[in-house]
C-alpha cells in the first residue's frame, strides 16, 4: 500500500482570488530552492512535502503534523465546474477544498453555491479569507505568515479584520457550520478553520497549507491509501484536440497504476460504455525542457496515482467530461457494470410534472440537481448532453400541465439545430448558463414574474371589493335606470357589477358611469361620477347618502382571500371584510369561512372533491 497526496480543489465567487491563489502556490514553489520542486501534471500541480515544509516553517511542528504525506495535489482549474466534473462514486474526486472569498465582500452568490456543493459532497474544507491586503491601512509583507503579519498592523486595522472575519463566522453559522479564525479554533473536529490570506502577496499561505494538511491527517488516513499495482481508476477532466496528436483525454488518476497499452473503459454522452486501447501516455515536460525542445509533452510507459495524465487513444470522440475511467484488461463485463452503475448512482428523484435539466458532465448534473432539489424545484428528467428536439417536445408537454414547468435548465450545453427549429414553434423557456447559481436564480426570478403576471391576469378577471356613496341632492333620475351622482369610497368599480345595500338586498346592476360627458368602463377610489343603476328605484331601493357595496360570490371572495389579497389596497381589504359581515348576517353565518370539517370529504365524489377546493 502507498499513501498518495490529497487532491485539493479551490472554489469561490468570481474574482475572489481562486486563480491568483493557485498561481501564487505554484509560483512560490517554483521559486523554492528546495530539492525536487513541484511536479507539473496534466490539469494539476503536485507540491511535495519538503517544499511545503519550507513554506510553512515551524507551523507543521507547532500543529503537531507529521510529515507523512507525499505532498498536496492541486487541481489547476479552479471553481465549481472542475470540482463537480471531477467526481467519483460517493462524491467529489477532491479530498479537500479551499473555499476562498474576498474578506472585504464576504459571502457572494457563488460562495453560497460552492458551500452547498461542498456540503452535499461532504468534502472537508478550509475557508481562505482573501485580500487582507485590501483592508484600508494594511501593511503588507510579501510571503509572511499571517501570525507575524498581523502583529505589524495598527489596532484599528486588526479590529476591522476581526469584524469581517466574524461576519463570515456568522454567515457560516446560518448555513449550519461552526467556524473560527484558525488560531482561535478550540475544536478542529467540529469547527471550520478560517485563514486570513492575501493570494496576491502570499501572506497567510503558510497557515493555509498547514490547515489543509491538518484536515488531511484528521479525515483522510484510510482514503489516501492506494494499491500501486492495482488497475487504475480515474476521472476524465476534458476531451480535447492537441495539434499533432488528435483527440486526447485529460484524466486525473486517484487510484492504482495506468500503463501504456492498457485497455480502458469510459462513458459517452449517451451513457454508453466505450472500450479503447491506450496508444500513448503523456505528461508535461519540465519547464526548462519545454523551452529547449519546443514540445510540451513527453511519453511515459506508466503513471501511478495520484496523477494527471494525457491519454492518446482512438474512438474517444463521445467520451463525456466527468466520466469515470477504469482499466479493463481482463474483466470487461464487471468494469462495464461498474461504469453504468456510476450513472445510476446519481440519485435523481424525478416527478411526473417538473422541469427538464441538461448538463455537460455527470458531476455538474449531480450538482445542479442537488441545488434544484434544495430549492424544492421538481424535476421531470435530468440528462447529460446537448438539448435535442425530443427535449423541446417533452418540455412543451410540461408546459401544457403548468407554464412554470415548460422549462429546460441547461448547464454548459448547446441547443442542437433541430431543437432550435422546434423551439421557435413552442412557448417553452430555455435557461442556459455556465454558472449553476445563475441558472437557478434566473429560473426562480422568471417563475416569480410569471406568478405576478398570472395574479394580475386573475385580478383583472374577478370582481374586486368596492363601495360607493349616493351623493345628496344628486339623484338625476328615479328609475329605469336610476341615475345618481356617486362617490367611490374604496376599490375599483366596473361596469356590469351588481350593487347591494348593508342589509344584503340587491339594489341593481351598474349599467354605465359618466364624468364630464365621457363614458367610463371603470373608476377608482376618490372618483365622483354619474352612475346609471339598472332595475333600481330611488327611495325604494336606495336613498341619498346610502352606502352600497359591490356584490360577489363566495368563490370570488375565496379567490381574492387565498391568492390575491397581497394585491389589494388596505381600503379594499376593509371593504371585503365589511361585505363578509353583511353576508354572514343576511345569508350564512359561515359565508367566506373555509370549512375545516374534513369528515364531509368522505361523502364527496371526485368532481365534488375538486369543487370543494
From Swiss-Prot:
Q: Where is this region: G3?
A: 76-79
Q: Segment G5: which positions? A: 198-200
Record's GO cellular component terms: cytoplasm
One Pfam match, by short name? GTP_EFTU
Q: Which CDD domains match?
A: aeIF5B_II, IF2_aeIF5B_IV, IF2_eIF5B
The alphabetized UniProt keywords are: GTP-binding, Initiation factor, Nucleotide-binding, Protein biosynthesis
For binding GTP, which residues are annotated in this chain's numbering?
Answer: 12-19, 76-80, 130-133
GO MF entries: GTP binding; GTPase activity; translation initiation factor activity
PROSITE patterns for this protein: G_TR_2
Check the record and name the SUPFAM superfamilies matching this protein. Answer: Initiation factor IF2/eIF5b, domain 3, P-loop containing nucleoside triphosphate hydrolases, Translation proteins
Instruction: Provide the residue span(s) of the region labelled G2.
Output: 37-41
Per the record's keyword annotation, is Nucleus included, yes or no? no
Q: Residues annotated as region G1? A: 12-19
Which HAMAP family did the record assign?
A: IF_2_A (MF_00100_A)
This chain belongs to the protein called: Probable translation initiation factor IF-2
